[in-house]
């Protein structure tokens, strides 16, 4: 049995958002969960209409909820959540509109930039005005080849505000990788920066744009923002000029709950990457649930995730604004000059949540990095994702980074633009284990024949009931062959996620890697995380 590394105090449990949420449920539905997470999770999947309705209210989502919560369909992915609901995604993220800090950006060079909530609101409204002026309408696609900067978020929010569809690639994608993705969705506008830094090198993005335009004829306009405020002469539309020359557009039209908000991409290991389309309300309610109930993010918290704009954790981080938390961006190498870049950033700004990839923690462990000398007094939560966090790395975090911290190993993916197996504020942390299934997500582990495995047996991660953040569609998939092949080929009308996983006796999970990456020596399946320990 894996050892307990950390347990929340009674005070911490009672001060959590999840405790407040479950107390409201107990009173309203005359039920008692105590602080038994599994009981609460069971209720959330067995009474999922009540659960998702209560989430909308508890998170104070702005929009029209509608009376119908779930419109069921015999076909799993055709089930609709809040079918009469309407929201404006951007409005839910920028409504704080005061003079406190909303976003901080730091590049690997140490350059920092900040924006307050009221300026974020204003610039979003001006950029949306520009989009309308040049004829951008709902469902038009905006492509962004961008570093992880404040301007990236402003252009995303402006896009969402007018009902257009956002899609981003990070600068480390080569030209062909960008074209393989964006060509499929026929964007009207390309947003980019003049350059970016990585590992001490200044890399031009302007040099790559002519080739991209040659290969994607649908792009009619290019908008360029200045990285680190340094101007570079170019023939494209200046982001700074847009802000100076356009009016404030404070009209927040509400769109259907499942109106497309962004397009993400599968890895593209075989053929062209698949274009995964996510709905605005679907993504918002799922991400707010994860941040507020599972990661205990509160108003004025300081939320950081090390991510690029080509990874779904960027979308997840941006949703922190909907929780009225400040978010912190980092662009560049996490190990440039020193291995303490990110820890120092955490200390300088006193992050409350510090999110990284499992491989980052593994690298710190390998280098025997000791973070004890840093002042991380406000750090409540560390989250790790991207690959399984092995037992030894759990132990390292508690020994060398912080003893009293909630270490949340989390796992989900681009397909759900969220998290399936996740942390929670009620349970203890066991070395090597993800704490729990996500609320409202009917997680199970199946064998090859579609039967639930026993505790301790490895199998396939599945979801047995529809959930909000399923893709609303795949782009260019009129026959639905792509979406059906991606998730429903193995088990009939059951979401097959493609992770090789085991449920533990502690109520948690251990993920061993992707199902299609497991090896079978002598007929025994071995996951990638077991090979690379």
Predicted segments with their positions:
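AMP-dependent adenylate-forming
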Residues: 27-31, 90-116, 226-232
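Conserved AMP-binding/adenylate-forming core of the ANL superfamily
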Residues: 38-43, 103-157, 174-179, 234-241, ...
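Conserved pre-ATP/AMP-binding loop-to-beta segment of ANL
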Residues: 99-101, 223-224, 234-238, 242-265, ...
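AMP-binding/adenylate-forming catalytic core of the ANL superfamily
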Residues: 144, 169-194, 209, 347, ...
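Structural core segment of the AMP-binding/adenylate-forming
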Residues: 161-241, 350, 357-358
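Conserved AMP-binding/adenylation subdomain of ANL enzymes
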Residues: 284-302, 311-352, 367-369
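Gly/Ser/Thr-rich phosphate-binding loop
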Residues: 325, 351-355, 366-429
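Conserved ATP/PPi-binding loop(s) of AMP-dependent carboxylate-activating enzymes
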Residues: 437-438, 451-488, 526-527
